Structure formats: structure tokens, C-alpha cells
Amino acid sequence: MIKKDNTMNLDVKSNLAKLLATENITIQHNAVKTASFDVKNRVLTLPIFKQKSGDVYDMLIAHECAHALWTPYEKWEGITDSELRSYVNVIEDTRIDKLIQAKYPGVVRNYENGFDILEKQNFFGISGKDINKDFMIIDKINLRSKSLNRLPFIFAPKDNDWLAK
């Protein structure tokens, strides 16, 4: 919720997160680059942006609450290789985003608008790049998911196995 003076009520956003997560998770608003969820300790950390957008915040909250609902701590902690963990995180993000959007269809619009706002700010680093030539398959999967399949990716036939998962 954005107040009339264009400030964001962080208490309201914290309560929204607890409702979406369906538990009394701990909420922190810190000077971090992006949101995160500590699956073990049940702590959601949200960034404090200079330019606030309700859609971006709601998208981040929904995504991190999806981790609260569906990311299994034991399996996640068992992945010790950092490169493998990065790949698994992209696949997990794709999986849980589909689940949260099915559980709470109203957040789909937040995802669309939030992605558009972040893309305009070049948050994803795609400005001036050929998304079909300059990105690895895992980055393409990540951006395809985050954009809700709205970016014009062309995948090689060998990539279809990854896309099916």
C-alpha cells in the first residue's frame, strides 16, 4: 500500500508478508540490494529502496513468502557447491513463483508491473544486450520466468529438457 504522500507503509508490507507466508515470520527492512528469505530461521529481509514501488515490494514479498511456503530447508542446505546452488536457486525460484501465483492470483499483476519497473532501471543487466546470444541457458530461464514469459527468448532444441522442468 502506498500512502497519499507516496511513502510506503512498511508495517502494512510486513503484515502482508506474514499473511502470504501463513505464519508469523520475522520481517526486517534493511539496506540490502534485494529481498531474501532465511528458510531455516524464518526471516524475510526486504530492501529499503530510494524510489518505492508497491508492485516491486509486493512482487518481492510474494516471491520470498513462496520460499517460506515451499522451499525445503533440509534439501536446500544439502547443496554445498556454490555454482550448483545458483542453478538450483533459479529452478527453485521458477517453481515457487508458479506456486505462489496459483495460490494468490492477484500477485500476477504485481509480478508483471514489478518486473517492468525493475527492467526499466536495468536491475537485471539486460539493457543493450542480445538476450538470445549474450546469456547462458540458466540466465535465460531465470529472466524468462521473472518476466512471466514476456521476453522474446529463442531457445535451442537441446534446451527444451530444461524448460520442461
Walk through the language-model features, giving the residues of each:
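Short, functionally important secondary-structure microenvironments
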Residues: 1-165
